[in-house]
Amino acid sequence: KVDIRKLETYSQDDPDAYSYSGGLCLANQGLLEFVEMFKAPIKVLHPLLTATQEGNYNGTEGLSALPFSGIILAHSNESEWVGFRNNRNNEAFLDRVFIVKVPYCLRVSEEIKIYRKLLSNSDLHAAPCAPGTLEMMAQFSVLSRIQEPENSSVYSKMRVYDGESLKDTDPKAKSYQEYRDAAGVDEGMTGLSTRFAFKILSRVFNFDAT
């Protein structure tokens, strides 16, 4: 877009009058984060085609192509990506997208740390909490995300994922790598979200200690 303050000196199609404030302008030779990319209208995504393929894109005014050299990092939910991928009108984008799957947390101890961080930044930081509440919520969430193994207990699998050694207590328990190899790459992509778990905690928290 044009910087209105500079129109007194330059014409509208002069490069010096252009306001280089867009995402691609600011992220040139850097990293551009695109939040919820696949919810955006297709017209918004068009500049990304030439920016990623040819290293330039057209601005909103009558200027020559602007250079771009950087990385575009977009994140989205699985369902939105599947809908975008299945639309044949988006074939030009699919060849330029590299998928990095980010599963939910599969370690109970790390899930608890996430809850504590969320609670410390909320109005519930001073509210009383019964012992074991966060541990139970974390175990419930992680159990919903991991795949049930064959010839072994899913509870033992959860404990192994958390770094425990069960050789002396559960002879059927497998190693961490054996569980991961059997589960495949999609483990952790489904199940209860951390956002949902925090909503549950916010509802059951005891606001009144008396």
What are these regions (language model features)?
Residues 1-210:
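Conserved ASCE/P-loop NTPase catalytic core
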